[in-house]
Design a protein with these regions (language model features):
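ATP-dependent carboxylate-amine ligase
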Residues: 1-94, 99-116, 330-337, 343-353, ...
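Buried hydrophobic packing segments
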Residues: 158, 162, 181-185, 324-334, ...
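A polyampholytic, Gly/Pro-enriched intrinsically disordered region
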Residues: 191-194, 296-300, 467-476
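Acidic, Mg2+-coordinating active-site environments of NTP-dependent enzymes
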Residues: 222-365, 390, 411, 415-423, ...
Length: 483
């Protein structure tokens, strides 16, 4: 009798608990892939799948136990119990059920499919509620911001500037999907808000159009079109098409501001029904001039055909100035005075983990550009790093989601690091071969090139080699699905 009780307890603990533990790691990855099975399957490989068994591994972003995740866990538990019971009945061997842990990936995918009708119904209800809220605010000005990169920073800059005149709301964090925007509207948008700034992210054709159908923006900003998320977009043409879904959605009396510094945008001469303003660091409808840097930040002038404005900001880097230029264009369109714009720009702060400079009590300067990375942004970060006279150290895992150009771009990145830094610490083996090859071709000595398994190991190395007066650039941090 006691033996049977022990066996049953073991079956519950190991036969259900162990598969569920592995399922939680898989649910974590599914959540980072927007609960889309197609993206989840693309992530799956033997190498990646085996990594889900490392449940003690520290995560960059922990699993968020949303109501959806809790429903998914409940369905997984039910599936595990049913399958385990079937295995025991068929084999008459309770230990065979432990093999179910090897199929956690399939259990999570099946649970996601089974829950899909319920989730779709719930999401539609939330969507309809958000739509109703927007329709009840006909005087609300909605500004949409999208781009391969730069959209989050631009959103923050624009929010700070427009707040000098309007009661403004922006989508928080990286809430840039349809469901993220829906949640923002339902939880944060109030009748007293005058401007709503919506960040729009995309990983495949149609994503921007979907958000536009919800919010119907009257003003849009496209910060960049470049090779990003290529595993899902497959081509630069698809990236361009998707970003310009915003242009297609704007009304005839609307305004579109686009960054002409990117060739894909500059070469797109299609006419849209809305008014279009091209901005650039050099020559365009609106451009920059008289840029000067100092220890306190940057002075620059934004120039248009019939107006110009001199500004000062604590931000550094030309790409940040481009994002500010787009914000100034929208501020002008919405009637802010030059004085309001100047005050707003002077109050803009760097967004956390996006080229923010921090001076540590130890005397070390940290350039934190760890949110994500791309060829354009990485070059700008290295340009900033090269301006520091002290020993310069780069800590990076390289760039991801660049499709078949990933090796080539990371090799170029390595060569750029060699020209801008004294020491390189390459984190993770995802891009290690490409970056180290570029570092060597760029002329960096092997003794200055180090490879760390993870950020924790990189930190240990830094503690040994860094000293007061040094400058450390953290360029990118890989999502958990790549670790």
């Amino acid at each position: 009798m006691l033996c049977n009780i022990i066996n049953i307890a073991a079956l519950v603990v190991f036969g259900v608990g162990l598969p569920l533990l592995i399922c939680l790691n898989n649910i974590h990855i599914l959540q980072q892939n927007s609960y889309r099975n197609s993206r989840y399957r693309r992530w799956f490989s033997l190498k990646n799948y085996l990594s889900t068994f490392k449940w003690t591994r520290k995560q960059k972003l922990p699993l968020v136990y949303t109501p959806r995740v809790k429903r998914l866990i409940a369905t997984c538990v039910i599936l595990i119990i049913i399958i385990q019971a079937g295995i025991v009945l068929l084999t008459q061997n309770m230990y065979c059920g432990y093999l179910l842990t090897a199929f956690a990936f399939l259990i999570v995918q099946a649970a996601n499919i089974l829950n899909a009708p319920i989730e779709k119904s719930i999401a539609q209800g939330y969507y309809n509620d958000a739509k109703r809220i927007l329709e009840s605010m006909p005087n609300l000005t909605i500004v949409a911001v999208t781009g391969s990169y730069g959209k989050t920073s631009t959103k923050h800059y624009l929010h700070k500037i427009l707040s000098e005149k309007f009661i403004t709301l922006m989508t928080p964090g990286s809430f840039n999907t349809t469901l993220g925007v829906v949640r923002t509207i339902r939880e944060h948008l109030k009748p007293y808000h005058q401007v709503f700034i919506v960040e729009m992210g995309a990983k495949q054709v149609g994503d921007i159009e979907e958000i536009c159908k919800l919010v119907n923006p009257s003003i849009g900003i496209i910060t960049a079109v470049a090779e990003q998320h290529m595993e899902t977009f497959h081509s630069l043409e698809n990236v361009l098409k998707t970003k310009f879904e915003l242009a297609e959605s704007l009304p005839a009396d609307g305004l579109l501001a686009i960054n002409n510094d990117f060739p894909a945008i500059a070469e797109n001469h299609r006419q849209y029904k809305c008014r279009t303003i091209r901005y650039s660091q050099t020559q365009a409808d609106v451009h920059l001039r008289n840029i000067s840097y100092s220890s306190s930040g940057t002075k620059f002038e934004v120039v248009a055909k019939d107006w110009s404005i001199e500004l000062q900001t604590s931000l550094v880097g030309k790409y940040n100035l481009s994002n500010l230029t787009a914000s100034v264009i929208v501020a002008k369109e919405l009637g802010l005075t030059d004085q309001q714009i100047k005050i707003g720009v002077s109050r803009v702060e760097q967004v956390e983990h996006r080229l923010s400079i921090k001076r540590q009590p130890s005397g070390i300067t940290v350039i934190d550009d760890a949110f994500n990375s791309n060829p354009y942004g990485a070059q700008m970060a290295l340009d900033v790093l090269s301006g520091f006279p002290s020993k310069r150290i780069v800590v990076t895992p390289g760039m991801i989601e660049l499709g078949d150009k990933q090796f080539e771009e990371n090799k170029k990145f390595g060569a750029q690091i060699a020209r801008s830094a004294d020491i390189a610490i390459v984190v993770n083996k995802v891009n290690a071969d490409a970056i180290t090859e570029g570092l060597r071709e760029g002329g960096m000595d092997n003794s200055k090139i180090m490879v760390a398994k993870n950020l924790f190991e990189a930190t240990t190395i830094l503690n040994k080699i860094s000293a007061a007066g040094d400058t450390i650039l953290y360029e990118n941090d890989l999502p958990d699905m790549f670790k």
